[in-house]
């Protein structure tokens, strides 16, 4: 079976117009990505140029040990909605959850994508089980460890999407019987150096922003010591939090049902991990609408290594 990889009309603008998406809406999306990247609205035309080539970027999305919450974060996104993102902006050539193909046809699509002369970007969701030669996780009778070991070294760029893929996440919580690891820990012997987009779930704008940066610069963005892009993970949640003035004033909510909590006082005494968590949640929010602290819940430190072990109990500081 021959499957079209990364092809379309002249460019993304024409494909979007055919689907009723205006240039204005497309530039609005590009502006949101530019702001997420810390470049400001003036950078939106550069984002547009990176996405408007005649060939859409081919993306291979692999699933390992996970709950599919990271995929849900993309599927629930708007501006653009997921159909616009995967049909007109990117060429998502393999994604087990949403692809139409199944069985042998799905495997054929994967093989064609990873062997395309035009190359591909790999996005990985979920921790990689490594114990007992990876026997705890299989797809199409191949261990997830074997699949990632075979495919990821071929990719032009590898993006570990979500805390399970970056640091092991809940899959690696003690006692971790499956030996689950993040991509870089599991495959460092193969020279794989994934860009880590941490979060449980991660923000889809951080994923698209990373892809845009790579398309424009043909290189990974500046990374911190944990391989996270500093344009998204360069500050703590605490430093960007709208409740920071209350922290500085020593005004802490004593309980969730208190009047102080309703007034927006700091949630540090209720377990907020914002001071030790690097992420841009207060800046971009989810769907540019809300994020946990604005909704009255403490940050649980989900974008940090070992957060299921190191950050619990969640409601103690």
From Swiss-Prot:
Catalyzed reactions: 2 Fe(III)-[cytochrome c3] + H2 = 2 Fe(II)-[cytochrome c3] + 2 H(+)
Signal sequence interval, chain numbering: 1-50
E.C. designation(s): 1.12.2.1
Localization per Swiss-Prot or TrEMBL: Periplasm
Organism superkingdom: Bacteria
Needed cofactors: [4Fe-4S] cluster; [3Fe-4S] cluster
Cellular component, GO annotation: [Ni-Fe] hydrogenase complex; ferredoxin hydrogenase complex; membrane; periplasmic space
Record carries keyword Signal: yes
Chain residues that bind [4Fe-4S] cluster 1: 67, 70, 164, 200
GO biological process, one term: anaerobic respiration
Matching Gene3D superfamilies: Cytochrome-c3 hydrogenase, C-terminal domain, NADH:ubiquinone oxidoreductase-like, 20kDa subunit
Annotated positions binding [4Fe-4S] cluster 2: 238, 241, 266, 272
Binding site for [3Fe-4S] cluster: 281, 299, 302
Database matches in Pfam families: NiFe_hyd_SSU_C, Oxidored_q6
Cofactor note as given: Binds 2 [4Fe-4S] clusters.
PROSITE patterns with a match to the protein in the record: TAT
Described function: Catalyzes the reversible oxidoreduction of molecular hydrogen, in conjunction with a specific electron acceptor, cytochrome c3.
Record's subunit section: Heterodimer of a large and a small subunit.
Family statement: Belongs to the [NiFe]/[NiFeSe] hydrogenase small subunit family.
Name of the featured protein: Periplasmic [NiFe] hydrogenase small subunit
Species of provenance: Nitratidesulfovibrio vulgaris (strain DSM 19637 / Miyazaki F)
Gene from which this protein is expressed: hydA
């Amino acid at each position: 079976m021959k499957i079209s990889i990364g092809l379309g009309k002249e460019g993304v603008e024409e494909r979007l117009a055919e689907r009723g998406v205006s240039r204005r809406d497309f530039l609005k999306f590009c502006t949101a990505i530019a702001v997420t990247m810390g470049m400001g609205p003036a950078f939106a035309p550069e984002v547009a140029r990176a996405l408007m080539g005649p060939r859409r970027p081919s993306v291979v999305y692999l699933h390992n040990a996970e709950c599919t919450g990271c995929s849900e974060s993309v599927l629930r996104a708007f501006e653009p909605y997921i159909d616009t993102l995967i049909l007109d902006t990117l060429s998502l050539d393999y994604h087990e959850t949403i692809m139409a193909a199944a069985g042998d046809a799905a495997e054929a699509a994967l093989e064609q994508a990873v062997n395309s002369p035009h190359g591909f970007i790999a996005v990985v969701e979920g921790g990689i089980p490594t114990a007992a030669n990876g026997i705890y996780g299989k797809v199409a009778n191949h261990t997830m460890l074997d699949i990632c070991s075979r495919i990821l070294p071929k990719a032009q760029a590898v993006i570990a999407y979500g805390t399970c893929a970056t640091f092991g996440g809940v899959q690696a919580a003690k006692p971790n019987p499956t030996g689950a690891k993040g991509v870089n820990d599991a495959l460092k012997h193969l020279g794989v150096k994934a860009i880590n987009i941490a979060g449980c779930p991660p923000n889809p704008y951080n994923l698209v922003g990373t892809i845009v940066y790579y398309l424009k610069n043909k290189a990974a963005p500046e990374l911190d010591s944990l391989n996270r892009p500093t344009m998204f993970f360069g500050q703590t949640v605490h430093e960007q939090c709208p409740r920071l003035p209350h922290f500085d004033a020593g005004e802490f909510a004593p309980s969730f049902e208190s009047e102080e909590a309703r007034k927006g006082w700091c949630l540090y005494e209720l377990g907020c991990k914002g001071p030790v968590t690097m992420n841009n949640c207060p800046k971009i929010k989810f769907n540019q609408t809300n994020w946990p602290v604005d909704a009255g819940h403490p940050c649980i430190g989900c974008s940090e290594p070992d957060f299921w072990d190191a950050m619990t109990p969640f409601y103690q500081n």
